[in-house]
Design a protein with these regions (language model features):
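N-terminal catalytic cores of NTP/NDP-binding nucleotidyl/phosphoryl-transfer enzymes
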Residues: 2-77, 94-111, 116, 133, ...
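Helix-rich, typically C-terminal accessory recognition domains appended to large enzymatic cores
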Residues: 122, 331, 343-382, 392-500, ...
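Structured secondary-structure scaffolds
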Residues: 2-50, 102-106, 150, 156-370, ...
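Intrinsic disorder at enzyme termini
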Residues: 474-561
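A glycine-rich helix N-cap at a beta->alpha junction
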Residues: 78-91
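Cys/His-rich short segments
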Residues: 117-170, 174
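Phosphate-backbone binding interfaces of nucleic-acid-interacting proteins
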Residues: 541-662
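Secondary-structure transition/capping motifs at alpha-helix termini
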Residues: 1-4, 38-45, 66, 70, ...
Length: 662
């Protein structure tokens, strides 16, 4: 058995229950599960928590649109989240719901404690509020008048509220981050938090709302509900037994958390708000917050309206659980966003799972049966290529240890497949089918098959955290069991004389893309149909195309005011994301004989690659201004629906660059 290395408490972000999670959301639970299984193999006593975030204005509005109570709505969505988490074989130890009675009771106590000690005070809030992000913003923080995080419209908000004294703890948090370099990972996330939020100065945080009711009431002032982020973040301590009046032994054992695994879009809440709340509660901070990248559909944001959303259950139906796990783990870089398309999934399935792994196991077991009746024996008759194979196999564990210590999961799984590739090369080098023709080479053939069987056993054991079902199927075919982690750098432990299965199972049969495509088309058509139904429900029975959006009229302008604005057709020559912003793109736009640099808040709906070559409508004489530190010399015109989806205004007919819009 691996040496007991102590506790390892890890969490995912709890999933927001506004709808069914797609594969981009599901990526996090698969990633977390791989880490949890790996840590267990290493010898840690892992406690792995996940769950659902179930309060907030957005959920109340969704429930009203569905004509059911908020609790009925979150019960349905939370059940769907848990079903999908179970479907992808996640081995969590605890599934928390923020509507759980014990959580709500503890949140009330936490709020009261912070109020009693002077960290929370009563005041009034006036500013802008983003409902999808559940975030408050000042006018100066908005980008193009919209939420700087998601790019959607914000609404004026003025209400009595309770506030948390964030500024009181800011210097202490800055010192902590500077003296704990592993606290925020990757480093780019740390730099973003320091430069964009902490160093410019923190404002006190609104921690209650009165404009909606779906939340945890403030115990001593029940017309207020607790701000969703104070409610949601505390799940990491409430569910394991924290109590301001006296915590449980489980809490004392598990806290502080060793890892909070979250999406990069909520790093601010977990590395600024959460540690400051903990400081106020006089609790130690988590050891690490890791903000993973996003998984994008073909480089684009997933959207039902486009029919391009990929759900985990659809992937599992078409390819199986472990193929789904393999794709999202293998394709996600350490820091940058990954890309998923149906074509890429099929390509990886055939090249990696069917060819490299499945073919290797099948050939090895089949040759053992064909040449030795399935009995695997080490004869000690070695060849020149054996040493290199053994060196690669026995070194793989330590290479994986190095990668997993930095949470480079994609790199770790690549190391396992490098082992399998080396095994395939070993078959080509030793040519067992040639050895089998020479009776004098029988002992050498036996040794070759022993080396392959031992190598595959080690590889399967290393593969287990990532593809658990496949790893177990492999060792069953080899009539052995998964190897202990401490033994995975040793070669020759496969029991001599073991008989492998006489009926090898095809682990991954190659897929014909032509057979899959009709199923993909049906999935996409269904999504568009569901989207249209949702839009009709939201728009009072009208389709999305028929719907009318009412907006508040702005102050009238004169014709002279209008003629001051110059609109022309522009052609986008190049485009790139703005480094300091999650929503901005910077485009070089050719307008007649000139080229202007224009910064636009359209990143959530367009990738830089999509922008290049588009003909767009441009306000060309807008006074230049800097957005996120980048000069912008005009404005691209867009339409926006009530869901915040942006669509660039483009000429209906072909028009030359520079054509006047009148």
């Amino acid at each position: 058995m691996a040496e007991n290395k102590g506790k390892f408490y890890m969490t995912t972000a709890i999933a927001y229950t506004s709808g069914k999670p797609h594969i981009g959301n599901t990526y996090e639970i698969i990633l977390a599960d791989a880490i949890a299984r790996y840590k267990r193999a290493e010898g840690y006593d892992v406690y792995f928590q996940t769950g659902t975030d179930e309060h907030g204005q957005k959920i109340q509005e969704k429930a009203e649109a569905a004509d059911i109570s908020p609790k009925e709505f979150v019960d349905q969505v939370s059940g769907e989240v848990k079903r999908i988490w179970d479907l992808v074989n996640s081995s969590y130890d605890s599934f928390v719901r923020t509507t759980d009675e014990d959580h709500e009771k503890c949140v009330k106590k936490i709020f009261k404690k912070l109020y009693d000690q002077g960290d929370i005070y009563k005041g009034s809030y006036e500013g802008m509020y983003c409902t999808p992000c559940e975030s408050f913003w000042t006018e100066s923080q908005l980008v193009d008048g919209k939420c700087p995080d998601c790019g959607r419209e914000v609404q004026p908000a003025k209400e009595e509220a309770y506030f948390f004294k964030m500024s009181k703890y800011a210097d202490r948090l800055i010192d902590y981050i500077n003296t704990h370099p592993d606290f925020i990972q990757p480093v780019s996330r740390k730099n973003e938090m320091m430069n964009n939020f902490l160093l410019p100065g923190l404002q006190d945080l609104c921690v209650s709302r009165t404009s909606f009711s779906w939340g945890i009431p403030v115990d001593f002032d029940p017309k207020h509900v607790v701000y969703v982020w104070l409610d949601a973040l505390t799940n990491y301590i409430t569910k394991i037994g924290y109590d301001p009046d006296g915590s449980t032994d489980q809490f004392k054992k598990l806290w502080p958390a060793d890892l909070h695994l979250i999406g990069k879009d909520i790093v601010r809440f977990h590395t600024i708000y959460w540690p400051i709340f903990l400081m106020a509660l006089d609790l130690p901070l988590p050891k690490q917050v890791f903000g993973h990248p996003w998984l994008l559909q073909g480089g684009d944001k997933m959207s039902k309206s486009k029919g391009n959303v990929i759900y985990a259950d659809d992937m599992v139906d078409l390819f199986g659980v472990d193929a789904t796990r393999y794709f999202v783990l293998h394709e996600m870089p350490f820091e940058n966003d990954g890309v998923i398309t149906w074509d890429l999934v099929i390509e990886r399935f055939n090249s990696d799972l069917a060819n490299i792994l499945g073919n290797l196991v099948n050939r090895t077991v089949s040759m053992s049966n064909k040449y030795f009746g399935g009995v695997v024996t080490s004869t000690g008759v070695t060849g020149e290529v054996d040493a290199d194979l053994k060196a690669v196999v026995t070194a793989t564990r330590d290479r994986i240890v190095e990668k997993m210590a930095k949470l480079r999961v994609a790199d770790a799984i690549s190391e396992v497949f490098a082992l399998f590739r080396r095994c395939n090369k070993y078959i080509d080098e030793t040519t067992p089918w040639v050895l089998a023709k020479d009776e004098a080479q029988k002992d050498r053939l036996a040794e070759v098959l022993y080396n392959l069987t031992e190598s595959i056993t080690i590889g399967a054991s290393l593969l287990h955290p990532f593809l658990p079902e496949t790893a177990e199927k492999i060792v069953v075919q080899l009539s052995t069991s998964l190897r202990d982690f401490d033994e995975l750098n040793q070669f020759g432990l496969y029991p001599d004389g073991t008989k492998v299965t006489d009926a090898p199972e095809i682990l991954f049969a190659r897929i014909d893309a032509k057979e899959i495509q009709p199923k993909v088309d049906a999935i996409q058509a269904k999504q568009k149909e569901e989207y249209e139904k949702e839009q009709k429900a939201l728009n009072g029975g009208e389709s999305a195309d028929e719907a009318v959006i009412d907006i508040d009229p702005k102050e009238e302008i004169t014709f002279d005011d209008f003629t001051k604005m110059q609109f022309q057709v522009g052609e986008i020559l190049s485009c790139e994301a703005v480094a300091k912003s999650k929503k901005l793109l910077c485009s070089q736009v050719k307008i007649g004989n000139t080229v202007k640099q224009i910064v636009s808040g359209i990143r959530k709906d367009y990738t830089p690659e999509e922008m290049v070559g588009k003909k767009v409508m441009v306000l060309v004489n807008l006074k230049p201004a800097k957005l996120a530190g980048v000069l912008s010399e005009g404005m691209l015109l867009c339409a926006e629906d009530e869901n915040g989806t942006l669509s660039l205004m483009t000429p209906e007919k072909p028009m030359p660059s520079g054509a006047e819009i009148c």
